[in-house]
């Protein structure tokens, strides 16, 4: 009898722990998102816009690949490889449909620190005479790409470790002001690093703490050595790039295909330099020989991993943060979701695997992602199509870029960072919404330009956490027990009864970046129907212990509170008396929820708001100004809801 029970128990245990086919299928779809969207791909509707976007993206990938390879202190051809392989891997594992992975200015700048430290220019004379069998490049160039590949490999390993540890859930610590300040500061660093090419000045590599200021000090000390030809070429290139891109932006709705000004400029500059022999006549620095083809894979030098650990952490964190911000932005814009942890896996593999193929560190770039938006890309097929054209450049067109001036590439880098640099304009909205966030932005930016992007990011996160922890103890929490979530029978003027549901929800905590995502999720759980009506909402039923929201039924969250609002006859009253303070992320979440509810025909009213909250929400969002949404009390809001219903019924009756 005991043996039979034991056997039965072992059979049940085996069934519980044997993975089912459906579970394996779901796991594969979760870890390989391409298996989810590729079978559903609509060739008729999506192939044409994806093809056009892919061609335009290829132009950007080639131009930025050459530019960011130079920024990373390696041969330009390795930037072309970095524009090819990471894009393919991200298309398989990534969830951002409009995220264009490839070479990236910030990660290139970070890896350049390791390259210049371990393989400085002073060692060039020792290796320049000995050419390797790899693409005919010198041992010096191969040593440099070896260091950059090692940074990419170790950075990708760090991202994969973060994926295994499920650290994607910790990304809520990365607030919008911190990310904005860090990327703006890093973009300022990148522009500074290109000054020597823009001015044609020969200068040593300068990095480290306060290196930003040392570079400009060196430039001013050697201002007389500025090369006039390079300066004029740079000014002309920047003017053309800015002017044409602004015109493309202004008329993008009227023209089907924007002018690929980067490609046109590269061709025109190379042709002009070739015809006038500027390299020999004026000493203008050009890209030089670009070999065609792809070399066989080679492992990065593992013996230097400990020496590049600092840069690898910088690449892992900065690259992931910048890429995740773009993925979340595209997801919000086009109404789909992105798994923060899956992005760790996608970007980790996009760095580890290409490191064996002579690639520099990769990440998503704002300019390329914005290009996919503007050209109407639908899926990652656009990125895969761009890889085909990048491959053509690698095998056929690359050698023709010999005469491309370095100052033109530097101009492309600088103009390509415009989207990051104009984030200075965010300071005004931070000042109007939350002055503490304004202070965090300024301090994070200063730390970034004084030290490095990863240092600035770390400072911003620590500073933000410290401020929130300092504010939370002073926060007042409100628990109202005498209000109920009610089904009201509203009698209209025509003595007709219409059932209207009014949900009264109290916000019981400050609304800041730490809890904004949870607030949004809990509120939407109350509003939206669940696919399984019999499944209780655990998070809502436990809201008294661990959530921001209290759906008020004698102070308790019950299953009734989880019933969805009717899409036509539902009003939501948010009691904000417990919202004692907020930050920019909290305000943006509140406004976005309001607009989302409005699009679902759910009327939202806010009661007991502080003057600062009303001012911040009015400044931030395009709120409905035709009817009031802010009220002094909950009864006042309910009174308006009843009045609006009576007026609506009276109007309907008069029309009949």
Swiss-Prot record:
Segments for region (Membrane targeting): 641-656
**PANTHER family recorded for this chain?**
SULFATE TRANSPORTER (PTHR11814)
* KW ATP-binding (keyword) present: no
Instruction: Output one GO MF annotation.
Output: monoatomic anion channel activity
- Annotated membrane-spanning segments are 76-96, 145-165, 167-187, 200-220, 223-243, 255-275, 307-327, 344-364, 384-404, 405-425, 449-469
Biological process per Gene Ontology, one example term? oxalate transport
Q: Provide the Gene Ontology terms for cellular component.
A: apical plasma membrane; basolateral plasma membrane; lateral plasma membrane; membrane; recycling endosome membrane
Q: How does it sit in the membrane?
A: Multi-pass membrane protein
Query: What gene, per UniProt, encodes this protein?
Result: Slc26a7
Chief location category: membrane
SUPFAM superfamilies the UniProt entry points to: SpoIIaa-like
Q: Which residues form the STAS domain?
A: 492-641
Briefly state the protein's biological role.
Acts as an anion channel mediating the transport of chloride, bromide, iodide, nitrate, sulfate, gluconate, thiocyanate and bicarbonate ions. Its permeability towards bicarbonate is weak and increases when pH is above 7. Mediates oxalate transport. Mediates thiocyanate transport in retinal pigment epithelium cells. Mediates iodide transport in the thyroid gland, playing an important role in the synthesis of thyroid hormones and the maintenance of thyroid function.
Record topological domains on the Cytoplasmic side = 1-75, 166, 221-222, 276-306, 365-383, 470-656
Q: How is its activity regulated?
A: Regulated by pH. Activity inhibited by all inhibitors of several anion channels and transporters, including 4,4'-Di-isothiocyanatostilbene-2,2'-disulfonic acid (DIDS), diphenylamine-2-carboxylic acid, glybenclamide and 5-Nitro-2-(3-phenylpropyl-amino)benzoic acid.
Q: Which family does it belong to?
A: Belongs to the SLC26A/SulP transporter (TC 2.A.53) family.
Q: Where in the cell is it found?
A: Basolateral cell membrane; Recycling endosome membrane; Apical cell membrane; Lateral cell membrane
Record topology, Extracellular segments: 97-144, 188-199, 244-254, 328-343, 426-448
What is seen without this gene? Mice develop goitrous congenital hypothyroidism, with enlarged thyroid gland and severely reduced T4 than T3 in the serum and thyroid gland. Animals fed a low iodine diet show more severe growth failure than those fed a normal diet. Develop distal renal tubular acidosis, manifested by metabolic acidosis and alkaline urine pH and in the stomach, stimulated acid secretion is significantly impaired. Retinal pigment epithelium cells (RPE) from Slc26a7 KO mice have a dramatically smaller whole cell SCN (-) conductance compared with wild-type RPE cells.
Keywords for the protein's UniProt record, in alphabetical order: Anion exchange, Cell membrane, Endosome, Ion transport, Membrane, Transmembrane, Transmembrane helix, Transport
Q: What's the protein called, per UniProt?
A: Anion exchange transporter
Q: Which Pfam families match?
A: STAS, Sulfate_transp
Tissue-specific expression: Expressed in the Reissner's membrane epithelial cells in the cochlea (at protein level). Expressed in the retinal pigment epithelium (at protein level). Abundantly expressed in parietal cells on the glandular portion of the stomach. Lower levels are observed in the kidney, with expression in the proximal tubule and thick ascending limb of the loop of Henle. Also expressed in distal segments of nephron, in extraglomerular mesagial cells and a subpopulation of intercalated cells of outer medullary collecting ducts. Expressed in the thyroid gland.
What reaction does this catalyse? chloride(in) = chloride(out); iodide(out) = iodide(in); bromide(in) = bromide(out); oxalate(in) = oxalate(out)
């Amino acid at each position: 009898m005991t043996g039979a029970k034991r056997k039965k128990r072992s059979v049940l245990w085996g069934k519980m722990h044997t993975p089912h086919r459906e579970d394996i299928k779901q796991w594969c779809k979760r870890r390989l998102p391409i298996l989810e969207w590729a079978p559903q791909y609509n060739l008729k509707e999506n192939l044409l816009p994806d093809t056009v976007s892919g061609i335009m993206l290829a132009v950007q990938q080639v131009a930025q690949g050459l530019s960011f390879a130079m920024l990373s202190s390696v041969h330009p051809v390795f930037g072309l490889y970095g524009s090819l392989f990471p894009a393919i891997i991200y298309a398989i594992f990534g969830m951002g449909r409009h995220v264009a992975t490839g070479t990236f200015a910030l990660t290139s700048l970070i890896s350049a620190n390791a390259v210049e430290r371990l393989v400085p220019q002073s060692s060039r004379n020792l290796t320049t005479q000995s050419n390797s069998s790899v693409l005919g490049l010198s041992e010096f160039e191969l040593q440099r790409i070896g260091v950059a590949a090692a940074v990419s490999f170790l950075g990708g390993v760090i991202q994969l470790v973060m994926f295994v540890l499920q650290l994607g859930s910790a990304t809520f610590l990365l607030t919008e002001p911190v990310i904005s300040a860090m990327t703006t500061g890093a973009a300022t660093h990148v522009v500074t690093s290109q000054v020597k090419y823009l001015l044609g000045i020969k200068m040593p590599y300068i990095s480290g703490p306060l290196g930003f200021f040392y570079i400009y000090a060196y430039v001013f000390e050697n201002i007389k050595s500025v090369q006039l030809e390079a300066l004029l070429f740079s000014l002309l290139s920047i003017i053309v790039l800015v002017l044409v891109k602004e015109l493309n932006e202004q008329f993008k709705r009227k023209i089907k295909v924007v002018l690929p000004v980067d490609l046109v400029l590269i061709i025109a500059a190379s042709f002009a330099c070739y015809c006038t022999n500027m390299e020999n006549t004026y000493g203008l620095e050009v890209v030089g020989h670009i070999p065609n083809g792809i070399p066989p894979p080679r492992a990065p030098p593992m013996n230097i991993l400990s020496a590049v650990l600092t840069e690898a952490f910088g690449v892992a964190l900065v690259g992931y943060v910048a890429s995740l911000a773009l993925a979340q932005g595209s997801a919000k814009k086009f109404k789909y979701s992105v798994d923060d942890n899956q992005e760790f896996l996608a970007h980790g593999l996009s760095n580890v695997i290409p490191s064996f193929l002579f690639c520099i560190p990769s990440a998503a770039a704002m300019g390329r992602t914005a290009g996919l938006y503007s050209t109407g890309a639908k899926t990652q097929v656009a990125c895969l199509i761009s890889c085909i054209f990048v491959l053509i450049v690698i095998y056929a067109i690359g050698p023709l870029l010999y005469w491309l001036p370095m100052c033109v590439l530097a101009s492309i880098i600088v103009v390509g960072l415009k989207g990051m640099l104009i984030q200075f304009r965010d300071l005004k909205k931070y000042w109007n919404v939350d002055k503490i966030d304004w202070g965090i932005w300024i301090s994070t930016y200063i730390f970034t330009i004084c030290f490095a992007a990863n240092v600035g990011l770390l400072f911003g996160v620590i500073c933000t956490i410290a401020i929130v922890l300092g504010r939370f103890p002073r926060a007042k929490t409100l628990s109202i027990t005498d209000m109920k979530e009610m089904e009201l029978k509203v009698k209209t003027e025509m003595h007709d009864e219409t059932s209207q549901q009014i949900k009264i929800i109290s916000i019981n905590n400050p609304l800041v970046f730490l809890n904004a995502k949870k607030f949004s999720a809990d509120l939407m759980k109350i509003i939206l129907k669940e696919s399984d009506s019999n499944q209780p909402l655990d998070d809502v039923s436990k809201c008294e212990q661990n959530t921001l929201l209290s759906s008020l039924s004698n102070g308790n969250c019950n299953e009734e509170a989880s019933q969805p609002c009717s899409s036509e006859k539902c009003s939501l009253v948010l009691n904000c008396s417990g919202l004692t303070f907020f930050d920019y992320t909290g305000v943006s979440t509140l406004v976005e929820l309001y607009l989302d509810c409005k699009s679902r025909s759910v009327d939202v009213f806010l009661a007991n708001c502080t003057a600062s909250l009303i001012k911040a929400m009015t400044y931030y969002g395009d709120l409905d100004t035709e009817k009031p949404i802010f009220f002094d009390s909950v009864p006042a809001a309910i009174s308006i809801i009843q009045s609006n219903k009576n007026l609506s019924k009276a109007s309907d009756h008069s029309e009949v």
